[in-house]
Amino acid sequence: DSQTGTFGIPEMGTNFVRGMLVEARPKNFSELIQISGLSHGTDVWTGNADELIRSGTCTIAEVIGCRDSIMLYLLRKGLEPKMAFDIMEAVRKGKVAKGGFAPGWEEAMREHDVPDWYIESCRKIKYMFPKAHAVAYLMSAIRLMWFKLYHPQAFYAVYFTVRGDDIDYEAAVGGAAVARAHMNEVKRRLKEEKNAKDEDVLVSLQLVNEMLVRGYEFLPIELGKSRGSKYVVEDGKVRLPFCSLKGLGGAAADALENATLHGQEYQDRKSTRLNS
């Protein structure tokens, strides 16, 4: 369901950014910074950088990705530092998009061989992200990517522990074919009517399907082994917790863990809060 493998990665897992990754094909860290900057700007990617890349005019490394790059690029071209800074500030605040370049700016850029596509790209931008923020976001994403690649079971266990409220138990234990069938059903419902609940369920199913397709398995709920709300790695697989059952609340799931895993006496339904 994805060409990027970035499901579950902050800043990189949304439909919008996954589409950017497919279009731009970043190959190194600096190009991923470009993706981070482009995804947080306004009118920086859509109808701007995406068209430049698609037409072959320039690459992901060359488009305007972060606000800082405008000033640095213009300085390399030989513009006066004050003018380079002022142009950057005007572009990143959307002032150029709204009212055009100040007198003399465009002429100076052309005199210093700034290409037409770059000047026109500046005209479209309404907001630009600072490079420092883009790097900070990307560093967090890279750390999680590393775990997803080299410690996948741990990654999925932690992901679902933190964001597993909408997990589909039947899909998790049923295998990739069941997960895909459930995904298709949710997508069908979303085409008919958008709603936040189904969108969250779809994200969860995408992670479930990805994990299964990669060859990793979920273990079903088992008394004495499952936790209340924590997914745990067991023999290279991910053990589902009690809370993965629909309708079983957190308090009841924790009570079941205490009763079955920690040796507490399992007396009656009331002690597990299952009848609350």
Stretch-by-stretch model annotation:
Residues D1-R273:
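Noncatalytic, beta-rich nucleic-acid-contacting surfaces in large DNA/RNA-processing enzymes
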